[in-house]
Amino acid sequence: VIPFVASVAAEMMQHVYCAASRRC
């Protein structure tokens, strides 16, 4: 498992959630 990929995926998911909920 590559930690970098996991980190990028986690950040992307959080960004999507932030944009969707509009609570940035």
From Swiss-Prot:
Q: Which Pfam families match?
A: Antimicrobial_1 (PF08018)
Tissue and organ distribution: Expressed by the skin glands.
Q: Name one GO cellular component term.
A: extracellular region
Q: Could you list this entry's UniProt keywords, alphabetically sorted.
A: Amphibian defense peptide, Antibiotic, Antimicrobial, Disulfide bond, Secreted
Q: Which GO terms describe its biological process?
A: defense response to bacterium
Secreted as UniProt keyword: yes
**Which InterPro entries does the UniProt entry name for this protein?**
Antimicrobial_frog_1 (IPR012520)
Segment forming the signal sequence: none
Which Cys-Cys disulfides exist here? C18-C24
What compartments host this protein?
Answer: Secreted
Function, as annotated, reads: Antimicrobial peptide.
Which family does the UniProt entry place this protein in?
Belongs to the frog skin active peptide (FSAP) family. Brevinin subfamily.
Q: Report the protein name in the record.
A: Brevinin-1Ra
Q: What is the organism of origin for this protein?
A: Pelophylax ridibundus
